[in-house]
Amino acid sequence: IENKYLNQFYILLIFSILSCDTSSDGLSGFSENSSGTGIGGSMARFTIVGDHLYTVDAYNLNTFDISDQKQPDFKSEIDLGWGIETIFPYENRLFIGAQSGMHIYDLKNQDKPSWISTYEHMTSCDPVVVQDNYAFVTLRGGNECMGFNNQLDIIDISKIDQPTLFKTYEMIQPHGLGVDNNCLFITEGEFGLKMFDISNLNNLKLIEHFKDISSIDVIPFMNVLMVIGEDGFHQYSYDCEEAKIEYISTIPIVKL
């Protein structure tokens, strides 16, 4: 394996480790803490909620009981259809991004999640994060994503069994995203990183656009933004109240 790919693997591994959360409520897992603030990557294909590990492949949702970490116990496999990509836990539910839409599953029975609803959209790549009554979904077209739209969809999930489109914003080439209170971060691939003020969902305000970095996914946590890109692992400090973001450091990927 070429060294550049090993470097990318190591940085992705660091990113996954930083996603882990050990909050005491047992239902927080990788992508939310006790306050409901997202701290996990939006493009993850696995997550932990309490004593259960949930993974997705291209077609299925798989559940494992990991209360005995030496002997994980497979519990269930649920057919989700096709083009399954990402998984994000929030308030005892799983939000699963697919190329055809967003599936929502309930975790009342953690051994076998139950379907609640599906929000359908045009074919595209589809990571998702959730905060309060809204899901934030980026749609990206081209290449493996097949579609042509590049946009942010804000989905109203106040009626969890009837998710509806609230508003759409055009983007350049959106990949992963992260949300923390009034801050929304969107990675635009080779077109950089964006930070938005989302205090008014009807009128998002662009706070900053870092055009000089490659960004694939983000984790906002405790006013530190962790960004993974093809060129390295970046950190920024941010303040949602002051609408500020500042560069801290980079661990570069050395191309050999």
Identify the meaning behind each predicted range.
Residues I1-N3, C20-L256:
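Feature marking well-ordered beta-strand scaffolds used for ligand recognition
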